[in-house]
Amino acid sequence: DANKTYTKLQTVGDRLTPVVRMEIEKMIFENQMIVVAYVPELPKNQKPCYITQKGRYEGAFIRSGDGDRRLSPYEVDRLAEGAFQPHYDIEPVAAASIDDLNKNTLTAIIRRARDIFPRVFATLPDETILIQLGVLTKVDDRICPTLSGLLVAGIFPQRFFPRLEVVFTVYPGVSKTGNEKTGVRYLDSKEIVGSIPDMLVETLTMVQMRMNTGAVLEGALRKDVPDYPLIAVREAVANALQHRDYSPDGRGTHVEVNMYSDRLEITNPGGLFGSTTIESLGKEGISSSRNEYLSRLLTYTPFESGYVVENKGTGFMVIESSLAQALMPPPKIQNSLTFFKLTFEKRRRTMIEMSNRSWEVIDEAIIAELTSRGSCSIKELMAMSGLSRATMTSHIRKLVRTGKVEPTENARSPKQRYRVVRNDHD
């Protein structure tokens, strides 16, 4: 009965917290009266919506398939964070002391802070600066590290939080079930520990060791191309460690970096935070940070020739740009209340690689290189192409025989080089 349904729907929203005002109307569809209700999405700072009588943890549901699923307490808490700025990243780690922090890293952070904000920090004592930045805090008149301080400068943070680590795994197939024929579940697995800079370095090293690097012809002879651009991987792993969920419930879950035969996945606990959406990733505008103190500290924390992050909301732009430059598709994004995942497709072999470089393509590349450089020796052409001496010599002899290339010296000269034959009217 459309009229009864219409009447009942008008009061449903009153039984929810916050109260939901639906747009309800009756209309004719295929000669039948139906009721259409539009339920506007609540702002993030008002979620989750729940049945008032059942309470927040028992009365909040999410649509799943053809049914409804009650949200877990973890999911409810993550939604509730939309109403405030979490400060889990500066909670004190009372069991730790300043002796658990790397002195060189602390010195670098202090120096960086004084360089950026000399009027604020130039005359302050080192300890005061570390407190102001959220590296240290006071608990009952005792100085101890914060969670952020431990993460950026800790010698071994996993002593206090064993699961705040990266687990890197290489699987032989396209799923975690492994190879059913051989029974091999994974080819390599490693727990990566230490501070965020330490984990980032080791994770990148493991990815580089386990992925393939191909050589393709580009214009003139050879260009090395990895399965995954390391710049993109670095940004993805850094973002996972920077923006993951560090709430007490989230500290039992690690960051996963999984390499399959066809893709690389980077997964962190906790979905996108605040105003950030999948659609806004990689776009210019205001960005949100779940861990604002940690994010700022990472801009002061040394890493290779710079710092761990820029904290300017450009990380995803760098990922997309580096993949585009490698002629690879954008990353696949999966986002939920409980996790965020980026998937990079493995670089597909080029036509040249699959055909093992056709004879004609190599000839064209040699001519292009000789034209560009003026002349080259056999040894130089071998180094640029990766081809053997016998193969390169065969190509050069053919090009000489067909009148496209000529030697610059006598046949047996140790200084022999080759150049493109000039036309008489050039």
Describe the function of each predicted region.
Residues D1-A232, A238-I352, A368-T371, S375-E380, ...:
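Conserved N-terminal catalytic/coupling substructures associated with nucleotide/phosphate chemistry
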Residues E360, P407-D426:
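Short, cationic-aromatic polyanion-contact patches
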Residues R357-A365, S375:
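Short helix-coil-helix linker/hinge
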